[in-house]
C-alpha cells in the first residue's frame, strides 16, 4: 500500500471496498439569495398583491420598435445573425414588448389588462455595452380593487401603483 497523500487513501478505500459499492452523492452547497433577487421577489409579490399579473415577454424585438417609445440617446444592440428579422435586436425598454401584448389582447376584445414585467433592457454607447434591470406596468380597461369594485383605469391608478411600490421599497 502506497499512501502518501489524501488522494492515495481515497484510492485505496475505493479499490478495497469496491468503487461500485460507493454511493454517488452530490455535495450540499448552501446558496444565498442575492440582494437583487430578494428585491425582485419582493416587487413581484407586491405587484401581484396589488392585482397585477406578471408577464414575461421576448427580449428580442424588431429594430423598428426600439426607438418607438423613448427619446433616450443610445444605439440598439442588433444581433449579427438573427433567426428572423422580426426579432433582430435586444430590447432597450420593455414598452414595445408590452405594447405588443396590449395589441394582442385588444384584437381579441380583452380590454381589461393589468400587467407588469420585470426584465432586462440592453444598450450600447460607442464601444460600451450594458444591461439594466427594469420594471414596466401596463394597465388598461377595468382595474379590480376588491370584491364588487371594478373601475376604469386612469392616470391616478397607475400613479397609485407606482407610489405604493416605492413606499413599500422604502
Regions found by a protein language model. Name each.
Residues 105-109, 114, 123-126, 131:
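Mobile "lid/hinge" segments at catalytic clefts and subdomain interfaces of large enzymes
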Residues 1-113:
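Extended, well-folded interaction surfaces typified by the phenylalanyl-tRNA synthetase beta subunit core
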Residues 16-27, 75-80, 121-149:
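Residues forming anionic-ligand binding surfaces in small-molecule and nucleic-acid pockets
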Residues 94, 133, 150-154:
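Short intrinsically disordered coil segments
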Amino acid at each position: 500500500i502506497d499512501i502518501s497523500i489524501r488522494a492515495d487513501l481515497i484510492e485505496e478505500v475505493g479499490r478495497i471496498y469496491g468503487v461500485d459499492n460507493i454511493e454517488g452523492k452530490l455535495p450540499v452547497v448552501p446558496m444565498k439569495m442575492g440582494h437583487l433577487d430578494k428585491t425582485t421577489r419582493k416587487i413581484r409579490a407586491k405587484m401581484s398583491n396589488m392585482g397585477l399579473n406578471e408577464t414575461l415577454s421576448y427580449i428580442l424585438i424588431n429594430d423598428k420598435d426600439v426607438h418607438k417609445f423613448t427619446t433616450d440617446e443610445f444605439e440598439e444592440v442588433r444581433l449579427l445573425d438573427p433567426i428572423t428579422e422580426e426579432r433582430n435586436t435586444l430590447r432597450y425598454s420593455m414598452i414595445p414588448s408590452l405594447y405588443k401584448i396590449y395589441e394582442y389582447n385588444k384584437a381579441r376584445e380583452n380590454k381589461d389588462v393589468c400587467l407588469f414585467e420585470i426584465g432586462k433592457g440592453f444598450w450600447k454607447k460607442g464601444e460600451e455595452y450594458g444591461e439594466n434591470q427594469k420594471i414596466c406596468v401596463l394597465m388598461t380597461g377595468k382595474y379590480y380593487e376588491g370584491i364588487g369594485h371594478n373601475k376604469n383605469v386612469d392616470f391616478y391608478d397607475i400613479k397609485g401603483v407606482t407610489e405604493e411600490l416605492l413606499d413599500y421599497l422604502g
